[in-house]
Amino acid sequence: EKELVQRIDRIDYKYLRDYLFQLSLQQSVDSIHDVINSLLIKGEPQYRIYDELILNVLNRIGDLWLNNKLSIADEHTMTETIRNVMYRIHSEISKNNVKIPKKVICMTLTNDEHEIPLVMIQSILDEINIPSTNLGPNVPVPSIESKIQAVNPTHLIISSNYVLDTDTFNSAISRLIKFCHKKDIEVLIGGSGNHLLIEENRSATIELKN
């Protein structure tokens, strides 16, 4: 415990990644939550904790599973543990009544079931008082368009971490770009799918970074 406190004080992400990896294997939701809360109390911004710690651990879990070094049961257990922590943190974020005059819709496209990045995005937006609607993972384009009509957002955030077919992916992005630009809605794309964008789509969207 003393070493953990010292590592958190030094914000030693290399150590903390290994530590959280083991905690997720043990399904220690409370312990992971405590580590992240300690970093937040120290003033670490949420986006850095997510990028340096959570996403890193999730990528490691995914890579080990792809290389048959982690069972599907362990992969599911570890991912679900981290997902539960993210939802708990999101529910605890204090929401200020003063909202910034922006409105965001976020989702993943068809076949992309990665839910955790969406929870992270929504938590960060809540922290800076930007209203957001999380449509969840695996949302078809017509459903996104219907929600845009209903909510009238200023920004559309597409989280893309799994692309089954590049042509279908770019076709969906192109359609959403045209739909959004008619309404002056900015389209942001985050995740590994960014590097699969055709140039026309890349130039018409904003890459979501920290």
Set out the residue ranges of the language-model regions.
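Long amphipathic alpha-helical segments
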Residues: 1-94
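C-terminal regulatory/effector modules of DNA-binding transcriptional regulators
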Residues: 68-71, 77, 84-210
